[in-house]
Amino acid sequence: MPRLRLGMMLVFVAALGLSSIGRVLAQASVQTQPIDPRGQEITLPAKPIVYASGASTWDKAFDSLLEAFKTVRAYLDKAGIQPTGAAMTIYTSIDDTGFNFQAAIPVAEPPKTPPPADLAVGTSPGGKALKFVHRGSFESTVTTYDEISHFVEEKQLDSKDVLIEEYTTDLLSTPEDKLVINIFVPIN
């Protein structure tokens, strides 16, 4: 199964109210590292970003995201623009066949010259959010998302229809079991 599919499938499953997937995965011997299930309430700062929009099926998720990030990074390098933060995926919609996303990299200010047509400049989502930290493989994000879903349901929080993953470790060079991903759940 592709590396991101399991994590993002859980978001879809949680949206349907099927929160028992964590127990099923535990029985399937998926190795995970526990997170702090409380989440940390923060105010997410809106930042200028350069991003590539895309859509992907679940079986091509990881490759689609990597290609999008490579495109953004190549533009920033060519334009001499330094990133001001970690790469992030902003999931704008999710369903059983795939998802729509923005593969974004924060910058200090919008570029003076517009990027090529396959890229855009915008602002990352800002405002009240819950921050969770996932440590481990993409496959183990399923349990992390299950814990997040339980927390949001238990606290009866009204989450927005967007999800953000911020990659604090390099997706290409970090051993998969050493990945660190900040997961932001914007709330109303």
Task: Give a label for each model feature.
Residues 2-6, 17-188:
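A solvent-exposed interaction/effector surface
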Residues 7-13:
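Sec-dependent N-terminal signal peptides
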